[in-house]
C-alpha cells in the first residue's frame, strides 16, 4: 500500500515486481473524497484505515472525515469526522484490545 499524499490517491503494488495492481483516486470511494492521503493501515479483518489529512493550511475549510475505514469492496464502514476536537490526522496506530486507562 502506497499512500500518495498530495496526489489524493493510494496505490496497491506487487512487492515482487513493482507492478501497480490498483489505484484509488480522490473520488473513487463513495461518500468521501481523499485529500492528502497519509498513512494507511490494513486491519486484521482486511479493511483499510486511511488517514485523510486536510492540509498545510491552519484554517482549512474542507468537510471530509479525517479517518476513513473501508472494506474489501471499497465501501466506507466507519469514519471519524471531528475537526473541532481532533484536528488533522496524518498517521494512526491500531491497537488490538485497547482499553482506556482510568482517568479519574
Where are these regions (language model features)?
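Histidine-/acidic-rich catalytic cores in large beta-rich domains
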Residues: 1-104
